[in-house]
Protein backbone atom coordinates (compact mmCIF):
# COMPACT_ATOMS: atom_id res chain seq x y z
CA UNK A 1 0.00 0.00 0.00
CA UNK A 2 2.73 2.44 -1.00
CA UNK A 3 1.25 5.62 -2.38
CA UNK A 4 3.01 8.44 -4.17
CA UNK A 5 2.66 11.70 -2.27
CA UNK A 6 4.20 13.51 -5.22
CA UNK A 7 5.96 12.58 -8.45
CA UNK A 8 4.67 15.39 -10.64
CA UNK A 9 7.30 17.18 -12.75
CA UNK A 10 5.75 20.65 -12.40
CA UNK A 11 5.45 20.24 -8.63
CA UNK A 12 8.96 18.85 -8.17
CA UNK A 13 10.41 21.83 -10.06
CA UNK A 14 8.83 24.05 -7.41
CA UNK A 15 10.46 22.08 -4.58
CA UNK A 16 13.77 21.16 -6.21
CA UNK A 17 15.91 19.16 -5.48
CA UNK A 18 13.13 16.78 -4.38
CA UNK A 19 11.99 14.46 -7.18
CA UNK A 20 9.54 12.04 -5.61
CA UNK A 21 8.02 11.11 -2.27
CA UNK A 22 6.29 7.82 -1.48
CA UNK A 23 4.58 6.84 1.77
CA UNK A 24 3.68 3.36 2.99
CA UNK A 25 0.94 3.82 5.60
CA UNK A 26 0.97 1.45 8.60
CA UNK A 27 0.18 -2.07 7.44
CA UNK A 28 0.16 -5.32 9.37
CA UNK A 29 2.26 -8.16 7.91
CA UNK A 30 1.74 -11.74 9.05
CA UNK A 31 4.78 -13.85 9.84
CA UNK A 32 6.12 -15.58 6.73
CA UNK A 33 9.21 -17.11 5.16
CA UNK A 34 8.39 -15.44 1.82
CA UNK A 35 10.56 -12.49 0.78
CA UNK A 36 8.60 -9.25 0.48
CA UNK A 37 9.88 -6.08 -1.10
CA UNK A 38 11.48 -4.86 -4.30
CA UNK A 39 14.08 -6.97 -6.13
CA UNK A 40 17.19 -5.67 -7.92
CA UNK A 41 16.61 -2.43 -9.83
CA UNK A 42 18.90 0.39 -11.05
CA UNK A 43 19.18 4.04 -10.01
CA UNK A 44 21.47 6.82 -11.25
CA UNK A 45 21.93 10.55 -10.68
CA UNK A 46 19.98 10.99 -7.43
CA UNK A 47 19.69 9.87 -3.82
CA UNK A 48 16.99 7.77 -2.16
CA UNK A 49 16.18 8.50 1.46
CA UNK A 50 14.21 5.80 3.28
CA UNK A 51 12.76 6.49 6.73
CA UNK A 52 11.42 3.55 8.74
CA UNK A 53 8.74 4.61 11.21
CA UNK A 54 7.71 1.03 12.10
CA UNK A 55 9.11 -2.34 11.01
CA UNK A 56 12.46 -3.15 9.42
CA UNK A 57 13.79 -2.77 5.88
CA UNK A 58 16.88 -4.57 4.57
CA UNK A 59 19.08 -3.06 1.83
CA UNK A 60 21.65 -4.67 -0.47
CA UNK A 61 23.38 -3.24 -3.53
CA UNK A 62 25.81 -3.92 -6.37
CA UNK A 63 28.64 -2.04 -4.61
CA UNK A 64 28.51 -4.35 -1.59
CA UNK A 65 26.63 -2.16 0.87
CA UNK A 66 24.28 -4.04 3.18
CA UNK A 67 22.17 -2.80 6.04
CA UNK A 68 18.96 -3.03 8.03
CA UNK A 69 17.02 -0.02 9.29
CA UNK A 70 14.34 -0.19 11.96
CA UNK A 71 11.98 2.23 13.72
CA UNK A 72 13.34 5.79 13.57
CA UNK A 73 16.32 4.82 11.40
CA UNK A 74 17.14 6.34 8.00
CA UNK A 75 18.89 4.90 4.96
CA UNK A 76 20.49 7.55 2.71
CA UNK A 77 21.65 5.95 -0.55
CA UNK A 78 23.51 8.01 -3.14
CA UNK A 79 23.08 6.31 -6.53
CA UNK A 80 25.25 8.93 -8.30
CA UNK A 81 27.13 7.22 -11.19
CA UNK A 82 24.88 4.17 -10.93
CA UNK A 83 23.88 1.38 -8.60
CA UNK A 84 21.61 -1.65 -8.60
CA UNK A 85 19.93 -2.25 -5.26
CA UNK A 86 17.13 -4.16 -3.61
CA UNK A 87 14.99 -3.53 -0.55
CA UNK A 88 13.08 -6.17 1.35
CA UNK A 89 11.44 -6.48 4.72
CA UNK A 90 14.17 -7.79 7.03
CA UNK A 91 14.38 -11.52 7.74
CA UNK A 92 13.71 -10.94 11.46
CA UNK A 93 10.67 -8.79 10.72
CA UNK A 94 9.29 -11.40 8.30
CA UNK A 95 9.75 -14.20 10.86
CA UNK A 96 7.75 -12.43 13.56
CA UNK A 97 5.45 -10.24 11.47
CA UNK A 98 4.33 -6.79 12.55
CA UNK A 99 3.47 -3.32 11.33
CA UNK A 100 5.45 -1.60 8.58
CA UNK A 101 5.30 2.16 8.03
CA UNK A 102 7.90 3.99 5.99
CA UNK A 103 8.54 6.83 3.59
CA UNK A 104 10.97 7.28 0.71
CA UNK A 105 12.14 10.57 -0.74
CA UNK A 106 14.20 10.98 -3.92
CA UNK A 107 16.68 13.87 -3.96
CA UNK A 108 18.22 15.06 -7.23
CA UNK A 109 22.00 15.42 -7.22
CA UNK A 110 23.66 18.60 -8.48
CA UNK A 111 25.13 18.04 -11.98
CA UNK A 112 28.69 18.17 -10.62
CA UNK A 113 28.01 15.13 -8.36
CA UNK A 114 25.96 12.91 -10.68
CA UNK A 115 28.99 10.80 -11.65
CA UNK A 116 30.53 10.39 -8.18
CA UNK A 117 30.84 6.94 -6.63
CA UNK A 118 27.71 5.46 -5.04
CA UNK A 119 27.46 5.80 -1.26
CA UNK A 120 25.33 4.28 1.49
CA UNK A 121 24.60 5.86 4.87
CA UNK A 122 22.70 3.79 7.43
CA UNK A 123 21.69 6.37 10.06
CA UNK A 124 20.44 4.93 13.33
CA UNK A 125 17.74 6.76 15.26
CA UNK A 126 20.07 7.21 18.25
CA UNK A 127 22.52 9.13 16.00
CA UNK A 128 19.92 11.65 14.79
CA UNK A 129 20.06 14.85 16.85
CA UNK A 130 16.83 15.99 18.50
CA UNK A 131 16.02 19.65 19.17
CA UNK A 132 13.28 20.65 21.61
CA UNK A 133 10.86 23.25 20.30
CA UNK A 134 10.17 26.32 22.47
CA UNK A 135 7.44 26.23 25.13
CA UNK A 136 7.22 22.42 25.06
CA UNK A 137 5.92 22.61 21.48
CA UNK A 138 7.44 19.28 20.45
CA UNK A 139 10.71 18.02 18.98
CA UNK A 140 12.62 18.16 15.70
CA UNK A 141 14.79 15.20 14.65
CA UNK A 142 17.41 16.73 12.37
CA UNK A 143 18.03 14.07 9.71
CA UNK A 144 19.79 16.36 7.21
CA UNK A 145 20.79 20.00 7.02
CA UNK A 146 20.35 21.87 10.28
CA UNK A 147 17.73 23.20 12.60
CA UNK A 148 18.36 25.95 15.18
CA UNK A 149 22.12 25.48 14.83
CA UNK A 150 22.03 21.68 15.22
CA UNK A 151 23.60 19.80 12.30
CA UNK A 152 21.78 16.74 10.95
CA UNK A 153 23.20 13.23 10.82
CA UNK A 154 23.23 12.75 7.01
CA UNK A 155 26.00 13.90 4.72
CA UNK A 156 24.38 15.45 1.63
CA UNK A 157 25.46 16.76 -1.77
CA UNK A 158 22.41 18.98 -2.20
CA UNK A 159 21.63 21.77 0.25
CA UNK A 160 18.58 20.16 1.84
CA UNK A 161 17.04 20.05 5.27
CA UNK A 162 15.05 17.02 6.31
CA UNK A 163 13.31 17.18 9.67
CA UNK A 164 11.07 14.65 11.41
CA UNK A 165 8.87 16.77 13.66
CA UNK A 166 6.61 15.68 16.52
CA UNK A 167 4.27 18.39 17.76
CA UNK A 168 2.58 18.61 21.14
CA UNK A 169 -1.22 18.67 20.81
CA UNK A 170 -2.70 22.10 21.41
CA UNK A 171 0.61 23.92 21.05
CA UNK A 172 1.48 26.44 18.36
CA UNK A 173 4.98 26.45 16.85
CA UNK A 174 6.80 28.45 14.23
CA UNK A 175 9.43 26.74 12.08
CA UNK A 176 11.97 28.96 10.39
CA UNK A 177 12.91 28.00 6.82
CA UNK A 178 16.03 29.81 5.56
CA UNK A 179 15.67 32.29 2.72
CA UNK A 180 16.06 30.66 -0.69
CA UNK A 181 14.74 27.28 0.50
CA UNK A 182 11.40 25.74 -0.44
CA UNK A 183 9.41 23.93 2.23
CA UNK A 184 7.10 20.94 2.07
CA UNK A 185 5.13 19.54 4.99
CA UNK A 186 3.84 15.96 5.16
CA UNK A 187 1.53 15.04 8.03
CA UNK A 188 1.17 11.35 8.85
Region locations from a protein language model:
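Generic beta-strand structural signal
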Residues: 47, 67, 73-75, 85, ...
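A short glycine-rich, His/Asp/Glu-containing loop-to-beta-strand
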Residues: 1-53, 131-174
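Glycine- and acidic-residue-biased ligand/ion/polar-headgroup-sensing regions
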Residues: 44-64, 70-74, 80-84, 169-171, ...
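"Short basic amphipathic alpha-helical interaction patches in structured regions
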Residues: 63-70, 89-92, 119-122
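Long amphipathic alpha-helical segments that form oligomerization/scaffold cores
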Residues: 107-140
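Short, structured patches in soluble enzyme cores that scaffold and shape functional sites
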Residues: 104-111, 124, 142-146, 166-169, ...
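Conserved double-stranded beta-helix
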Residues: 17-24, 73-84, 111
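Ligand-binding loop in jelly-roll beta-barrel domains
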Residues: 79-113
Amino acid sequence: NVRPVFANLAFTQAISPFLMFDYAAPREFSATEEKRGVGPHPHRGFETVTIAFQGEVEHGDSVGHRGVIGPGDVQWMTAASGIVHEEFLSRDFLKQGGVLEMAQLWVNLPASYKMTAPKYQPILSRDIPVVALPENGGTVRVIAGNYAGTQGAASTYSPVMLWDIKLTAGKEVELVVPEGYSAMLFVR
